[in-house]
């Protein structure tokens, strides 16, 4: 799976520079001099080698080895750049697409989180989206229709905090919740 890391907005100047709206946390790595970027535009794929880049008004100004003038730069308008995700082994972060689709369970009563085996409790539902707010990430969980919760069949927002979501297992496609009382009853 590849993630979009940026999109060409428009040409800038007459020497082939383009304005790129970066959608990555590490534009200085993704758009570094010499990097070969994979781009897509109207179903066509292309590769471009970064000659230089610099920050400009919250975006990037990028020049490519293959683009010599404004006319050539104009043809790049709308190109979306993609790259493989970079996983940091020390980082507990997750990409949204990794969390979406996971099945959420409550932690079984009496289960110790420090043990090797996590016992699953009642099925809660499925993560259908991740929302990013100034206060942090929220998981949008569609409560299972068979649930005994008053919010059965509805979406609830769950703060994505270790205290509330102590276990995320991407291999098993599950996450475990230890919500404060009443959280799953709010819709």
Curated annotation (Swiss-Prot):
Domain PRC barrel residue range list: 91-183
SUPFAM superfamilies found in the cross-reference section: PRC-barrel domain, Translation proteins
Principal localisation: cytoplasm
GO molecular function: ribosome binding
Keyword Chaperone: yes
InterPro entries per UniProt: PRC_barrel-like_sf, PRC_RimM, RimM, RimM_N, RimM_N_sf, Transl_B-barrel_sf
Family matches, as Gene3D superfamilies: PRC-barrel domain (2.30.30.240), RimM (2.40.30.60)
Listed GO CC annotations: cytoplasm; ribosome
Subcellular location: Cytoplasm
GO terms, biological process: ribosomal small subunit biogenesis; rRNA processing
UniProt keyword Chaperone, yes or no: yes
Keywords: Chaperone, Cytoplasm, Ribosome biogenesis, rRNA processing
Superkingdom, natural source: Bacteria
Quaternary structure note: Binds ribosomal protein uS19.
Domain free text: The PRC barrel domain binds ribosomal protein uS19.
Record family assignment: Belongs to the RimM family.
NCBIfam families (UniProt xref): 16S_RimM
Protein name: Ribosome maturation factor RimM
Organism: Corynebacterium jeikeium (strain K411)
Top-level taxonomy: Bacteria, Bacillati, Actinomycetota, Actinomycetes, Mycobacteriales
